[in-house]
Regions:
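Transmembrane-helix signature of polytopic, membrane-embedded enzymes
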Residues: 12-15, 99-120, 138-139, 153, ...
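Juxtamembrane membrane-water interface segments immediately following transmembrane helices
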Residues: 35-38, 42-44, 48, 204-311, ...
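Membrane-interface anchor segments at the N-terminal boundary of transmembrane helices
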Residues: 9-14, 79-83, 301-302, 310-312, ...
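Transmembrane signal-anchor helices characteristic of membrane glycosylation enzymes that use polyprenol
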Residues: 9-38, 207-219, 490
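Membrane-interface alpha helices of multi-pass inner-membrane proteins
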Residues: 160-174, 207-215
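Multi-pass, polyprenyl lipid-linked donor-dependent membrane glycosyltransferases
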Residues: 38, 63, 84-91, 116-148, ...
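Transmembrane alpha-helices of multi-pass, membrane-embedded glycan-processing enzymes
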Residues: 72-76, 84-98, 137-140, 454-465, ...
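Extracytoplasmic catalytic/substrate-binding loops of multi-pass membrane glycan-assembly enzymes
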Residues: 30-45, 58-71, 79-82, 228, ...
Length: 534
């Protein structure tokens, strides 16, 4: 172990790690080729619209921050996607090497332990074979964690400015990463004069705010909406309160009653709610994701585009105040789930391990239901309605809307014919990019074994607990640098739990921070002790 630890500190070690990581990625690719990940279509749409002066669907470009769509598009666009897998393997290697270098700041042994665990981590490999914000965040978070460790090992205002800039870049990957701005307190904890600490904290904040302000101005000038990203009010904390904990009720407060009146008058009399017999009590007691889509559209239409569905946030706050225990228990349960649930690749019985659409497999249940004496197609995915009432592009002026001609048939109406042409062109472009995803089928048996390995691999919570124990018992050198990436990972996980149900893909990209914590606290050097003279 001593020789290996010494070898890990040589100048050639990072190159060896990178080459090994590329090999691991391609071994996994035999079983699971690169495929579209969660919300894949939205990233294709956002990339396709990024370079349009007048996007037809603002939901794509304002609902996401630009870095994830940009990375997904750049991987698929050149040479009909021929470079997608080679480039992704290099990005995976870069992330693994970043974790290795971060751990090497605490010695060769922690570096060896960290890189070995990350390379063997099936869930991390699965995420890195899917095109979505999950893999992009995994790459960006690894690089940011390396930067944080190095800056905290040798702190300076300039270094903390780079860390703040890195936080802003993480926000450009996922809007929810704005929670990491609270790490501006970290410079106040370093060993330095108070003037230096305050300047460092200010540098962190100013660097982050400058880039995020530039994005806000860009969105305002280009799209007419001065925001980092739209849609936050429909997610945090409304999605969890409405969809997961089911605590939204008209009697919770004035905003809840106002929303219920709008639902009763403007949504439930329309298709498909009318034919599928959805009443007001059903709407709130048995909600579905398609209903959230309709609530967002309803809020924008009734209370104004500029409010960005603010009433949904107010409704969620009323629900949490009325049912604080239910919400708190739900959040705690989701945090626990995110820390211990494995990630699986979606497999299909036909032996195809290519696509990970996120859609469940067919359940084999009866495909029709009887409602009010009428036989209707059963909605997919166990939902109450077959599709949202408003499922079209997001347009501030309402010039594009959905018309229903039966309980299941509907189509888009464009008030301007040019908009319809642009909409068709957008989806043709998205189909072109989708066709560039590698079409290899993979190996069903090996993919199944990889899923089984993911199930039994030690979960993130184990590394977190080991790290905490190591900190308490050994008190290793450089504790602040060791702890900060793990704190950032926990912040991201808790924020996700405040908004959504358990989706392990949200936690796995940040899980190596807990591995780093465990390896550094258990195998890293202790602070040098000063012996008092006799």
């Amino acid at each position: 172990m001593g020789r290996l630890a010494a070898a890990a500190e040589t100048r050639w070690a990072p190159l060896v790690v990178a080459v090994a990581a590329v090999g691991v990625w391609w071994l996994q690719a035999v079983a699971i080729p690169l495929a579209g990940g969660r919300d894949f279509a939205t990233y294709l749409g956002a990339y396709s619209e990024l370079f349009h002066s007048d996007p037809i669907d603002l939901g794509y470009v304002l609902g996401r921050t630009p870095l994830s769509p940009l990375v997904v598009g750049v991987l698929l666009d050149p040479f009909h996607g021929a470079l997608a897998e080679p480039l992704m393997s290099l990005l995976y290697a870069a992330s693994v090497t970043a974790w290795f270098l971060a751990a090497r700041s605490f010695g060769g042994a922690p570096a060896l332990l960290t890189v070995a665990i990350v390379l063997l981590y099936p869930g991390y490999g699965i995420v890195m074979h899917e095109l979505s914000s999950d893999s992009v965040f995994a790459i960006a978070f690894a690089g940011w964690s390396l930067l944080v460790v190095r800056v905290l090992r040798s702190p300076s205002p300039r270094g903390f400015a780079l860390v703040g800039l890195g936080v802003a870049l993480l926000v450009l990957v996922r809007p929810g990463n704005q929670v990491l701005l609270v790490l501006a307190v970290i410079p106040l904890l370093v060993s330095a004069r108070w003037r230096t600490r305050l300047v460092s904290s200010a540098a962190f904040v100013l660097a982050a705010v400058a880039l995020l302000a530039a994005l806000t101005v860009h969105n305002g000038v280009r799209y007419g909406d001065y925001t980092i990203a739209r849609g936050g009010n429909t997610r945090l904390p409304f999605e969890r309160a409405f969809l997961t904990d089911r605590i939204v009720r008209p009697e919770n407060g004035p905003s809840s009653r106002e929303l219920a009146r709008a639902v009763r008058r403007e949504l439930l009399p329309q298709e498909p709610y009318r034919s599928y017999g959805v009443h007001l009590d059903d709407f709130f007691s048995d909600p579905s994701p398609r209903m959230i889509d309709d609530l967002g559209a309803l809020a924008n239409r009734k209370w104004g585009w500029e409010n960005d569905a603010r009433i949904l946030r107010d409704v969620a706050i009323e629900a949490i105040r009325t049912h604080p225990g239910t919400y708190s228990r739900g959040v705690a349960t989701t945090v626990w789930d995110l820390l211990h649930q494995p990630v699986f690749r979606v497999l299909y019985s036909g032996g195809d391990a290519r696509q990970n659409s996120g859609a469940p497999e067919a359940s084999g249940t009866q495909d029709t239901i009887v409602i009010g004496g009428r036989t209707l197609p059963r909605p997919t995915e166990g939902q109450r309605i077959p599709a949202p009432h408003e499922g079209g592009p997001t347009s501030p002026d309402g010039s594009i809307y959905t018309v229903w001609t039966s309980p299941i048939e509907h189509h888009l109406v464009f008030l301007r014919s040019a908009d319809e042409e642009r909409y068709i062109a957008l989806h043709q472009r998205m189909d072109e990019l989708r066709a560039n995803v590698p079409d290899r089928a993979g190996n069903y048996t090996l993919a199944l074994r990889l899923n089984q390995a993911s199930r039994w691999f030690p979960p993130p919570v184990l590394w977190l607990v080991l790290g905490i124990v190591g900190l308490a018992v050994r008190r290793p050198a450089g504790m602040l640098a060791l702890v900060t990436p793990a704190v950032a990972a926990l912040l991201v996980i808790v924020l996700d739990a405040l908004a959504i149900p358990s989706v392990p893909h949200y936690a796995v990209p940040a899980a190596p921070a807990f591995v780093l914590l465990a390896a550094g606290s258990l195998a890293g050097p202790r602070p040098a002790t000063v012996r008092m003279p006799p």
